[in-house]
């Protein structure tokens, strides 16, 4: 138990659910997690197929701020991930091949719980990238086309954050991808060793 633990997220990005086993499984996982710790909300599937949850969480890595805003909420419609439930072989948590055509009405967001964008951004930046002679795209990874200058990075980040903040009447919160670089993923706001990667006062101002 620790105060920094805000919620439990048993599953991530389940986009290939079958219509028979997964709904029952996800419902059971929600119940079990809540019984193990009734003091914290359960985000049953982060960024994937939602059955029962205390937090409706979506992932969207659109890099253009205006398009990001439009995708998350437009004309009264919230963003929902596209589920692939008609594959011959579903690819979720270790289930055997099942009939993917069973009738199941997947829930749509109805406002009864918080709606969070708990993955977005992921903008790639390699420290001292502007000083490098080679294109680091081949050596590391991030979402979208990497910015070519630090100023371009700050502009894109601020645009994305402002796009979500402008939806404060619909979106309850956000989580940026990600806090630190991880192995080949060079999209953190800190380096892998937790050293500063940017002007952190400027980063703080953007996220504030």
Predicted regions and their residues:
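Substrate-binding clefts and catalytic carboxylate motifs of secreted carbohydrate-active enzymes
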Residues: 6-8, 31, 76-208
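Short, structured secondary-structure boundary patches
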Residues: 1, 63-67, 197
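Flexible loop/turn segments at secondary-structure boundaries
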Residues: 14-18, 50-52, 64-65, 123-127, ...
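Active-site neighborhood of glycoside hydrolase catalytic domains
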Residues: 1-56, 62, 112
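Short aromatic-enriched loop/helix-cap "lid" or pocket-rim segments at secondary-structure transitions
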Residues: 20-22, 54-56, 68-71, 128-130, ...
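Short, hinge-like loop/turn segments at secondary-structure boundaries
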Residues: 58-63, 74-75, 192-193
């Amino acid at each position: 138990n620790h105060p920094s633990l805000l919620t439990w997220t048993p599953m991530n990005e389940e986009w290939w659910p079958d219509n028979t086993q997964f709904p029952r499984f996800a419902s059971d996982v929600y119940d079990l997690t809540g019984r193990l710790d009734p003091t914290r909300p359960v985000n049953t599937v982060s960024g994937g197929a939602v059955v029962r949850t205390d937090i409706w969480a979506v992932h969207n890595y659109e890099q253009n701020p205006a398009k990001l805003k439009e995708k998350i909420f437009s004309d009264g419609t919230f963003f929902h991930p596209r589920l692939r439930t008609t594959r011959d072989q579903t690819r979720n948590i270790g289930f055997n091949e099942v009939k993917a055509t069973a009738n199941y009405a997947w829930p749509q967001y109805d406002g009864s719980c918080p709606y969070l964008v708990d993955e977005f951004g992921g903008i790639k930046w390699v420290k001292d990238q502007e000083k490098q002679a080679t294109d680091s795209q081949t050596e590391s990874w991030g979402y979208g086309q990497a910015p070519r200058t630090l100023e371009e990075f700050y502009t894109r980040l601020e645009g994305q954050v402002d796009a979500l903040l402008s939806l404060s009447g619909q979106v309850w919160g956000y989580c940026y991808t990600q806090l630190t670089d991880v192995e080949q993923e060079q999209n953190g706001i800190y380096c892998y060793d937790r050293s500063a990667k940017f002007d952190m006062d400027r980063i703080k101002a953007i996220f504030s």
